[in-house]
Amino acid sequence: MTDTQTQKEAVCTAIDDHRDDIIELAKAVEEEPELGYKEHATTDKVTAAFETMGLEIERDLAITGARASTDLETSADEFTIAVLGELDALVNWEHPKADPETGACHACGHHAQLANLIGTAYGLSSTGILDRLHGTVEFIAVPAEEYLDLEYRRSLVNDGKIEFLGGKQELIKRGYFDHVDCAAMIHADADTPEREILTRSSTNGFIGKFVTYRGRSSHAGAAPEEGVNALNAAMLGMNAVHAQRETFADEENVRVHPILTKGGEGVNVVPADVRMESYTRAKSIQAVNGANDSVNRALESGAMAVGADISIEDYPGYLPFQTDKTMIEIYETNAVDELGSDAIDTHNPHTTGSTDMGDITQIIPGIHPMIGGFEGTPHTPEFQAVDDEMAYIIPAKLTACMIVDLLANSKTKEKIRQQKEQKYSPEDYLTLIREMRRSVTGEYLSD
């Protein structure tokens, strides 16, 4: 038996020894869900687990994030892999575990990500293997992946507390990935109660937008001709967006899905202040930017048609995610050993949702396998873990074993570093997403 195989067996045994602790943490997080940049209690739970392992801990990363390692002063020469877990919940008031005051719930499985994070840390730290690996592992609890509660996040931007609405973007900006060579995390798969893993995938990127149409109020029954109907402007704008859809190439997987968040003040008043939010999604950065230009032009046409004013505030959403082939092949080998080849799906579908793990994979290689053990579709009331072993324990074993294999092989580490060189530098990445932050205005309201 090789030293690497012996280490992996020790890691898996250690994770089994801490099985109850890992599952207890996941369920405690699930019972106390918190929204992005507000995850104080969740971070307390995660860092308390890190403390039991004797790891160095840094808190208050991008407000609520945290990281831990045996040595947080890693040199740039040391090969570093980051294991990530997301802290935040989403809002679904119908979910059975939704917070009655905020609607927050873990209907996207982030509590399972934290189990993977903590479980991997237990496996590598309690065995002492972290100190013997040829490289460094950082465990990072990341805030604010779900792109919601946006008025609160915009207030943080306006107060200078953050620049970006997404947690990983903010951590990149603050330099926490400058020295990291690659990253790994997991995600709950949809409607997969079986012990199966979809290992490879890609996702859309997107730009988020806030739109305000301003018209002129008037009595809707007695004098509508004296008003300028901002709701009509918004409806025309959305219809103009729909007229653009045939121009979007099928292979770019463009998605545009606006909602009205304010339609007026009252039925008997011509709407003068109408608000909209939307995403423009696509498979490539170029397609996101191109489709977004078309969407903004269409939205402005609605204001022009009725003589209303419009303001559009574009914010960088998330960039497209790509699975790293070198890392995922190591992960798959360990997954086959644990679950058998029939349980591993490698067909690499493209999904049209988005994640800020995409931003990470634009600057360093990364993986984001989709884990079984869950019923229901993420973000719905039906979503729940139904197999504790698959949802919380097995992923930690696979992540930890992949790390042991990866750090034991100097050629693999060199290959990953070469792949990192082909990606955006953090500086170029920040330039790219800052260019997505734009304001568009159109003034058509007459005096």
Question: Can you say where each PLM-predicted feature lies in the sequence?
Answer:
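Divalent metal-coordination and catalytic microenvironments
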Residues: 29, 83, 110, 139, ...
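Acidic-glycine-rich active-site phosphate/pyrophosphate-binding loop
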Residues: 77, 83-97, 202-214, 369-378
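Histidine/acidic-residue-rich, glycine-tolerant segments that coordinate divalent metal ions
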Residues: 92-105, 111, 118, 127-257, ...
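Structural motif
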Residues: 79-82, 136-138, 181-184, 366-369
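Metal-dependent amide/peptide-bond hydrolase catalytic core
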Residues: 2-3, 232-447
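Acidic/His- and Gly-rich active-site-bordering loop/insert found
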Residues: 3-107, 111-138, 143-144
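Histidine-centered active-site/metal-ligand motif
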Residues: 30-32, 106, 110-113, 185-187, ...
